[in-house]
């Protein structure tokens, strides 16, 4: 069925959960529970504080409510041994199916995915990895897709994972969950060059003395939303999120990062670098949440945007909810054009305007994406 111009997309106006959408009868009760939440909450629009820069409800109104072709391919080193499961994992572990609602119950896109998830990958990593795992998510054609990825990392494990999000002409609504055990570390490189309207909700749950380090390169060709929710479940855990955003012309890149310091002695570090050309827009919301009894927390937020055209725009909203004094927090936002004094200096050294700007922009990108990063190969040619 197709979405029509009404107050809500067509599939929200039906009285009952559309069980004809899939054949997962063993999970239908759980999926229907998520659907009822969705009907109460609705598809996100600018009236929701978390979505104040993005009107998803309007963006997907006319997209056909049918499945587009989507695949998730896992590429790994032959010597690395870990479990790969699909929907059977949730059939055997039904109590895990609605786990995202434990951390975020009032989010429409999460309940939408849980209602209609159609593609599943579950990775269970019990030992150190010798080489990075590559998770390649690719979509083709019109319609919608609701992929779900769950990664369980056991105690005392070091792992590296690369996510590639590409293609599509419709709407992709993805959930990614990573549970990180005690004394474990995961390094993540994420690429977004989706041509669909793309929404991903990313959860990480950090055990004692664990860490996650995420580097993101976002080059959307349409409207994109990446929202990250890090929960510090136990002490001495840390999360680092660094993102470079270079949207194509007439594209939009929207980010939200929520670091929830549920335990003492934890660190979070969030950074954003946006390079914005003609008819592009980027948004960055960062929230630090430190409860009253939580001690010795450290949290950093940093956002810098370079506007290369008068028709480029950047929105930034750093926010801190801190209920005690035993915390060190820093945040800063800088939005503007390239430094003309720096360009003049490079001109005086024999470089033309284009060459000077390229060097300055490469310097900004290299703050987060180093020469040895796998993301370097995906940068637009003019920034390599």
Language-model segments: which ranges?
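Short acidic alpha-helix initiation/capping motifs at coil-to-helix transition points
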Residues: 14-16, 334-341, 359-360
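Conserved beta-strand/loop scaffold segments within soluble protein domains that form the structured core
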Residues: 97-344, 348-351, 365-384
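Short secondary-structure capping/turn micro-motifs that flank functional sites
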Residues: 54, 362-363
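N-terminal amphipathic, basic helical "cap/leader" segment at the start of enzyme domains
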Residues: 2-119
